[in-house]
Amino acid sequence: MELKLLQADGQLGTGVSASPEVFGRDYNEALVHQIVVAYQANARSGNRKQKDREEVKHTTKKPWRQKGTGRARAGMSSSPLWRGGGRIFPNSPEENFSQKVNKKMYRAGMRSIYSQLAREGRINVVDSLSVDAPKTKLLADKFRAMGLDSVLVITDNLDENLFLASRNLAHVLVVEPRHADPLSLVHYKKVLVTKAAVAQIEELLK
């Protein structure tokens, strides 16, 4: 199969040969959903904290005697039943949100994403992508000429100039093939891949 070559002026050129084993698979929506959710879960860190009945400020003094008052018995003011008491099952920063995805499933999901991008025409190939200096304007002008605003760039050689020039562009992410993640692939409107990176992607997902 072929992927369309995107020229510097935004016009589509001749096709670039690509492996149907990676870019010609059927779309498995359930599998793609699973690996995207797992990626987000594994990137999540615990940032919630609630106090249990040991951690809230309290006294161990019994509020009133056990019998004879007519009120329900109570042991101490930190009871979860009381206002200001501790939580029964409090949220903790040590919570583990990670989800395991087998390598075989992950690679199959990534192939499914790349194939769907190719079918939708959202993935294009460029000969190479570089800038002469680490200037945001230079890279922004290149993307403007190509008609791109939200783009994930997968390059075989992420040099310092290209990395620094892309950092300040809000809707641009430049990565190497091994760092392309499922969330970024489905998030950005367009995916731009250098010719050499196509071969690297095929090698990673074969």
Curated annotation (Swiss-Prot):
One of its GO terms (molecular function) is structural constituent of ribosome. GO terms for biological process: translation. The keyword Membrane does not apply. This is Large ribosomal subunit protein uL4. PANTHER family: 50S RIBOSOMAL PROTEIN L4 (PTHR10746), LARGE RIBOSOMAL SUBUNIT PROTEIN UL4M (PTHR10746:SF6). Residues 59-70 have a biased composition (Basic residues). It holds the Pfam family Ribosomal_L4. Part of the 50S ribosomal subunit. One of the primary rRNA binding proteins, this protein initially binds near the 5'-end of the 23S rRNA. It is important during the early stages of 50S assembly. It makes multiple contacts with different domains of the 23S rRNA in the assembled 50S subunit and ribosome. Forms part of the polypeptide exit tunnel. HAMAP family: Ribosomal_uL4_B. Belongs to the universal ribosomal protein uL4 family. It comes from Ralstonia nicotianae (strain ATCC BAA-1114 / GMI1000). Residues 43-78 are annotated as: Disordered.
